[in-house]
């Protein structure tokens, strides 16, 4: 039975894990690392790089290296948070055909789902090379506070990557699964998850295989990226004060600042001071300029204090919704790379009145939880019951633009709820059902998930028709809504697709693009491997011809030299053809056989001479036989 993998699709890094017997195994990627940077780059020659190779060339190719794209997934281009991001990233954020925020690289527009799919493909390949078999099914994690549009876009990314996404699971819930799988006694825990781009807090009751989420809260635009950007702004500001040059206008300098900020942030978690040193960051008429600056932990903490404090209100709201006090929380589990920051740990300690639990790896625990959920769905992990909740209230717009809730936030899912509404005007023949998600009282202040019409209502006075609206949320947190006229039995239903979102046709096209890209990547890799093998053979054959060329006939030697020349031409072609290189490699190997034979014979002869010389040097030794009785004396 094919394995189901668990993938933590992170803003900054991604991770893949699988159930190995009763244990979870985090799988190392081709570069030997357990996490993969969530980065995709496009080079000038059309090559696509994912993960560490993309990160390595980011400084020299900033406008075509895409990172933190998860922050844009399922968001409209006009979203204020997108506006903020546009000013701080070196690549271009553009308006997609559907009104969503997309990204641009090498003059081509990509949806965030497409870029996420490329990262998922990399995780899929990582798992396949470890398992030695094809992987087609996965459980993918999302921030608990993701809305329906963001969840749907993540599911679309999985589909584009060629994965059947069996379940979308909330990151803090996954972390709780990994933390509490072997814990029998009942506990109330809080999972504080501050990652690269999002913040979640979930309160759960766990024990004896049951994981019940009591409440969840968070901020989908708060994470390590914001801490980095705050530091980038500070560094650019200091440099401008000192040199009068604004580095934010220089994409290359901006990318170098971003890398330096991330490095400094990490260093300051374990040391009190770090030095940021960026030589030749820019130049003006007077010559090159260098950025050198000492940064203390205290200064960094003062720069980001408001960001850390932004995690407090969601924590308090989650405790209130769960009906527990901070003192009733038995353990606070820290998840996400940013939870390593001492200031964050200090705030958590003050808030919950106890030292947070640091016994899980914050970068890997979410993927491990996803793998456990995959094991549950596959039947490999028994006696585990996971009860998650919907993070935001769901409802429809009613008369006067009021948001009428049908399902309150923190309702256990899957769930289904119906309510009967009527018309607002006489002889109304159709009603528009506008579905929103959020906590504000007016519909326009919440996230519009989608709308549809129920038509063909018989003419009646206002308030007479009985229209039953039903909300159905599945275990992935994805919504389906139906409206039924009780009088006529007419029914209309939709799976909510964000007002932007990707249509099935869009997804199909992207799936085909992804498959074509995977094929092109495979071809490119085969070309590189064939080229490496050919170059190695050329080098060794040329060396052999130089040393032993006189041992073969002139005709054989010329045939070898011609084959080398032909293979060199194939290797040096602008677009190396793997098949052509392999064929010419084979030819060179065949014509070199006589040379190989000659080398072998020459070496045999040398070995024979050496052993003959050795015999001449043998000296006969005198020896005396000792009798047994002498030996024992």
From Swiss-Prot:
Keyword annotations from UniProtKB, A to Z: ATP-binding, Chaperone, Nucleotide-binding, Phosphoprotein, Stress response
InterPro entries registered for this protein in UniProt: ATPase_NBD (IPR043129), Chaperone_DnaK (IPR012725), Heat_shock_70_CS (IPR018181), HSP70_C_sf (IPR029048), HSP70_peptide-bd_sf (IPR029047), Hsp_70_fam (IPR013126)
Chain positions with Phosphothreonine modification: 198
CDD domains documented for this protein: ASKHA_NBD_HSP70_HSPA9
Induction summary: By heat shock.
The keyword Phosphoprotein is assigned to this record: yes
Function of the protein: Acts as a chaperone.
HAMAP family: DnaK (MF_00332)
Family listed: Belongs to the heat shock protein 70 family.
The name this protein goes by in its record: Chaperone protein DnaK
């Amino acid at each position: 039975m094919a394995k189901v993998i668990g993938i933590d699709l992170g803003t900054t890094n991604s991770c893949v894990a699988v159930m190995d017997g009763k244990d979870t195994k985090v799988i190392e990627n081709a570069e030997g690392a357990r996490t993969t940077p969530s980065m995709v780059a496009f080079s000038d020659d059309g090559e696509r790089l994912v993960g560490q190779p993309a990160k390595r060339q980011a400084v020299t190719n900033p406008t075509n290296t895409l990172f933190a794209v998860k922050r844009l997934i399922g968001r409209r281009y006009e979203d204020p948070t997108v506006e903020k991001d546009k000013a701080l990233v070196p690549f271009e954020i553009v308006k997609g055909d559907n009104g969503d925020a997309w990204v641009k690289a090498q003059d081509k527009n990509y949806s965030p789902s497409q870029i996420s799919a490329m990262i998922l493909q990399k995780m899929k390949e990582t798992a396949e090379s470890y398992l030695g078999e094809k992987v087609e099914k996965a459980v993918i994690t999302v921030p608990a506070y993701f809305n329906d549009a963001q969840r749907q876009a993540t599911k679309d990314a999985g589909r584009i990557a060629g994965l059947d996404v069996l379940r979308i699971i909330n990151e803090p819930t996954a972390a709780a699964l990994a933390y509490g799988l072997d814990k029998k006694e009942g506990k109330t825990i809080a999972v504080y998850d501050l990652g690269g781009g999002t913040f979640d807090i979930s309160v759960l009751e766990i024990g004896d295989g049951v994981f019940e989420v009591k409440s969840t809260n968070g901020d989908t635009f708060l994470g390590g990226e914001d801490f980095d950007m705050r530091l980038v702004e500070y560094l650019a500001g200091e440099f401008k004060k000192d040199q009068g040059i604004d580095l934010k206008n220089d994409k290359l300098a901006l990318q170098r600042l971003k890398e330096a900020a991330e490095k400094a942030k990490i260093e300051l978690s374990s040391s009190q001071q770090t030095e940021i040193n960026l030589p030749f960051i820019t130049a003006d008429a007077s010559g090159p300029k260098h950025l050198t600056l000492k940064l203390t932990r205290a200064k960094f903490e003062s720069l980001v204090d408001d960001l850390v404090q932004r995690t407090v209100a969601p924590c308090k709201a989650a405790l209130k919704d769960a009906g527990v006090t901070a003192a009733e929380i038995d353990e606070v589990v820290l998840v996400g790379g940013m939870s390593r920051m001492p200031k964050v740990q200090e705030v958590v300690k003050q808030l919950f009145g106890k030292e947070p639990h640091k016994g899980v790896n914050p970068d890997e625990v979410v993927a491990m939880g996803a793998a456990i959920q995959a094991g549950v769905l596959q039947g490999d992990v028994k006696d585990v019951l996971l009860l998650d909740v919907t993070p935001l209230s769901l409802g429809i717009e009613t008369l006067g633009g009021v948001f009428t809730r049908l399902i309150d936030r923190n309702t256990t899912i899957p769930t289904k709820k119906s309510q009967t509404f009527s018309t607002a005007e006489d002889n109304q023949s159709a009603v528009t059902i506008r579905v929103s998600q959020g906590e504000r009282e007016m519909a326009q202040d919440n996230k519009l998930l989608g709308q549809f019409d129920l038509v063909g209502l018989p003419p009646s006075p206002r308030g007479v028709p009985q229209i039953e609206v039903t909300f159905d949320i599945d275990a992935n947190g994805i919504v389906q809504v139906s409206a039924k006229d009780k009088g006529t039995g007419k029914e209309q239903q939709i799976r909510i697709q964000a007002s932007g979102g990707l249509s099935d046709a869009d997804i199909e096209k992207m799936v085909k693009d992804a498959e074509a890209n995977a094929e092109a990547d495979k071809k490119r890799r085969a070309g590189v491997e064939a080229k490496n093998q050919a170059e190695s053979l050329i080098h060794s054959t040329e060396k052999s011809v130089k040393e032993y060329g006189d041992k073969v006939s002139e005709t054989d030697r010329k045939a070898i030299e011609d084959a080398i020349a032909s293979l060199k031409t194939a290797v040096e072609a602008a677009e190396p053809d793997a098949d052509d290189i392999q064929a010419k490699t084979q030819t060179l190997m065949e014509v070199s056989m006589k040379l190989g034979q000659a080398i072998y014979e020459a070496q045999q002869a040398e070995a024979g001479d050496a052993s003959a010389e050795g015999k001449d040097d043998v000296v006969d030794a005198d020896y005396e036989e000792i009798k047994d009785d002498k030996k024992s004396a």
